[in-house]
Design a protein with these regions (language model features):
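Acidic, PIN/NYN-like endoribonuclease modules and their adjacent C-terminal/linker elements
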Residues: 11-12, 17-27, 93, 104, ...
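Acidic catalytic patch
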Residues: 49-52, 71-94
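Short, electropositive alpha-helical surface patch
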Residues: 56-71
Length: 148
């Protein structure tokens, strides 16, 4: 069973402007990922960084939905020195923001097979920095799974 780490934007994608086709497709792909987690076909990770981002979300409806989705995450990861050290090394490798570096470090630390994000710039940064966390857009993940 795949262990996946979803960037926080995947938890919120369903609230973004559905008039843009890319956003609508990503929202559907994220919804499918959460349905697969519900059916125990995949495992998801919830980290202290997700929790932190959700605390600072100014929209109560979004916060509540993210907390509901968080219940689907079977693997939980709290703050650890090893994660912070790994995040610092990722920042040096790829000039990642602290937040992105911590999400990537959490994915790496939990041995998640995939890091899923709606942020194409982040995907390109991860790939060019040679960080060994397979990073995909949710639509690309669903497309790959359909080809199996």
């Amino acid at each position: 069973m795949d262990l996946m780490y979803l960037n926080y934007n995947c938890f919120q994608r369903g609230f973004d402007d559905p008039r843009q086709i890319r956003i609508r497709m990503e929202a559907l792909a994220c919804q499918e990922i959460f349905l697969r987690a519900e059916r125990n076909e995949i495992q998801l990770v919830w980290s202290f960084m997700h929790e932190d981002e959700n605390i600072f979300c100014p929209f109560s409806e979004r916060k509540l939905e993210v907390l509901r989705l968080a219940t689907l995450c079977e693997v939980k990861v709290g703050p650890k020195e090893v994660i912070y050290d790994l995040a610092k090394s990722f920042q040096e490798k790829g000039r990642f923001s602290a937040k992105d570096a911590i999400h990537l470090a959490c994915a790496d630390h939990t041995k998640a097979r995939l890091f899923i994000t709606c942020d194409n710039k982040l995907i390109k940064k991860v790939r060019s920095s040679k960080i060994e966390v397979t990073t995909l857009n949710p639509v690309d993940y669903i497309r790959q799974e359909a080809m199996k």
